[in-house]
Regions:
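C-terminal catalytic domains of large/alpha subunits in multi-subunit enzymes
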Residues: 1-176
Length: 176
């Protein structure tokens, strides 16, 4: 007698009595990791009385190969730029004598919101990368790191002082 079991029965049996379902994962690893490129330009306004920095506009152009999902690529770029703006202007972690972070909630750890930044414009220079999946390159790191030099240079251009530690706070600007 021949016995057979359907794939559906196997899937159901694999989950019965288990909290974790059966899972299959596939990844792509290129032999080379071609770098993405990005250029960023920031326009800032520095209040000479309060030393507050207002980011009026941030423009960027990103070459991340061929975007596999253009909408998600744009959101990734805009979100990373916002993280880079926060790293540059507001985000700071300090520690108490025991080594515990003093900024233990979003009330103390200041991340920028949409009202804290002006216009953010991102364009893409599409290219085909033969070593990437479907012609794509990475995008995550380049969009976070580019706002720092652009904003820092804009502040230096406005007040004539270059800063070498982050974040560039109004207190640091006032003491410059």
């Amino acid at each position: 007698p021949s016995k057979s079991v359907s794939l559906g029965d196997i899937a159901t049996a694999s989950m019965f009595g288990h909290d974790i379902p059966l899972e299959v994962t596939e990844t792509h690893m290129s032999p080379l990791s071609p770098p993405p490129y990005m250029v960023g330009a920031a326009e800032v306004e520095v209040d000479t009385e309060t030393s507050e920095v207002k980011l009026l506009e941030f423009d960027a152009c990103v070459d991340c190969g061929t975007p596999i999902n253009p909408n998600l690529t744009r959101v990734q770029a805009e979100g990373g730029i916002l993280q880079g703006i926060g790293m540059t202007l507001t985000e700071n972690v300090t520690y108490d004598q025991r080594g515990w972070p003093m900024e233990n909630s979003l009330m103390q750890y200041k991340i920028p919101t949409r009202v804290d930044v002006g216009r953010v414009r991102v364009e893409f220079e599409n290219s085909y990368e033969p070593n990437g999946p479907f012609g794509a390159k990475s995008i995550g790191e380049v969009v976070i790191n580019t706002p720092l030099p652009a904003i820092s240079d804009a502040i230096c251009n406005a007040i004539g002082t270059r800063f070498y530690e982050l974040p560039i706070t109004p207190e640091k600007i006032a003491m410059a």
